[in-house]
Structures are given as structure tokens and as C-alpha cells.
């Protein structure tokens, strides 16, 4: 039953993205991660736009297809200018779109990633789902920029995502410099290493992705450990 509801949510997100295809935005967050790693379920879809004019166009489409504008929850990941839209799929089940306007600002650290920076570090890629066979070609944030954003944010889900996609990083020196420009790199990498070194972390990965081979786990972990000593 739960899996059916999650599939329903994913199908709705893909339908929504197809409706928004002519809009000017970049996919970030969990759905962006799905372009670089084994797909996982994501509660909502996060997109970045440059200005209020684009927001008006996107909002018009979302309202037309059944979404309602909602007040962002207090525990929302983001801070600053962003709008949330939700569509009920069931009496207790909804899908949501978070639209970040002008920048992506992390609530905990107040680190800012300008929308222009996000667009400059994005490209057209294939978006894959976890439960549906459909694929979409969308503008998605590049892996190095996504890693920088998630390593600055450093929530539990961010660290898990970093672990899964870090072996595919393209320019580690650049990633480090982007983190350093917004936060204490030592603080962020220490937090990540502490988390991925715990037994609970591997168990948590298995809960999301199923069986995780020990050799692959160690390879991924070592990639991050070596990043800690890299010189930018």
C-alpha cells in the first residue's frame, strides 16, 4: 500500500514536470540526485528559478493542474524567498513542489547559492524515477554543484546523498572552494566523516537502497575520506 502511494507521488511529480517543461528552471534536491545515483523516493521536488516573473508563469500552471499554494513548514530546509505548492493525492497523502526564487538559501547555515550560479552549473540530463519506467530530459544541477550544496547543508539525507554520488565527482578542488566560500570546510567534512563512519549509517543505506556490498561501501567511504585532505 505504501509503495503504491509512493509510486503515485512519483508519477504525479513526473506529470507535473512535463507540464512545466517550457518553463525556465533547474531541478535540485532529491530528484537531481536521482540523475547520478540509484533512484530513491523523494518527498517533494525542488526547483530553482531566477525571478518572480517566472514564478507567476509556473504558479499559473501548477494551480491549473490542481496544486494549491501552501505556507512552507517551519522545519523546511530552505530560508528566504521560496514558495511551496501541494496537490492532494489522497486524504492523507500529497505531492509538493518547492520553488526557490533568485537563490537557494540553506535554513541552518544561511549559506546562499545564487540562482545564476545554479543555472551556470546545470545542464540537460535524464531524470529517472524509482518506481516508474519513464525518463524525462530536464535541466538538472551538475553533480559538483549539487555536492557543494549538500555538503554545506549536511542534514542526514544530504550526507546519504553525498555518499552515493561523491565517487562521480568531476572537480573536487572546485567543490571544496565552493564550500569554503560559504562555510567552514573542516566543520562540514568532519561532520560527514563522523556520520559515514557509524554502523547505523550503513544500515540506513540498506534500508533505502537494499543490500549494499561491503567492498563498494568501503570504496565510497574512502573517496570521501581522501577528499578531507585535498588541497584546493
Predicted regions and their residues:
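Compositionally biased terminal segments of proteins
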Residues: 1-232
Amino acid at each position: 500500500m505504501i509503495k503504491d502511494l509512493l509510486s503515485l507521488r512519483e508519477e504525479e511529480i513526473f506529470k507535473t514536470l512535463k507540464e512545466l517543461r517550457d518553463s525556465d528552471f533547474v531541478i535540485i534536491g532529491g530528484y537531481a540526485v536521482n540523475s547520478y545515483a540509484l533512484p530513491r523516493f523523494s518527498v517533494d521536488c525542488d526547483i530553482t528559478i531566477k525571478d518572480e516573473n517566472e514564478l507567476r508563469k509556473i504558479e499559473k500552471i501548477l494551480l491549473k493542474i490542481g496544486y494549491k499554494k501552501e505556507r512552507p513548514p517551519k522545519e523546511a530546509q530552505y530560508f528566504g524567498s521560496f514558495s511551496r505548492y501541494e496537490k492532494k493525492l489522497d486524504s492523507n497523502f500529497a505531492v509538493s513542489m518547492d520553488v526557490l526564487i533568485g537563490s537557494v538559501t540553506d535554513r541552518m547555515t544561511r549559506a546562499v547559492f545564487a540562482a545564476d550560479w545554479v543555472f551556470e552549473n546545470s545542464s540537460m540530463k535524464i531524470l529517472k524515477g524509482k518506481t516508474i519506467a519513464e525518463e524525462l530530459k530536464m535541466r538538472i544541477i551538475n553533480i559538483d554543484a549539487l555536492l557543494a550544496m549538500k555538503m554545506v547543508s549536511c542534514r542526514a539525507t544530504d550526507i546519504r546523498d553525498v555518499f552515493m554520488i561523491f565517487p562521480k565527482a568531476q572537480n573536487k578542488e572546485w567543490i571544496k572552494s565552493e564550500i569554503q566560500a560559504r562555510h567552514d570546510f573542516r566543520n562540514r567534512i568532519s561532520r560527514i566523516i563522523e556520520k559515514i563512519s557509524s554502523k547505523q549509517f550503513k544500515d540506513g543505506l540498506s534500508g533505502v537502497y537494499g543490500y549494499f556490498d561491503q567492498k563498494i561501501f568501503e570504496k565510497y567511504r574512502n573517496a570521501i575520506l581522501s577528499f578531507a585532505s585535498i588541497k584546493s
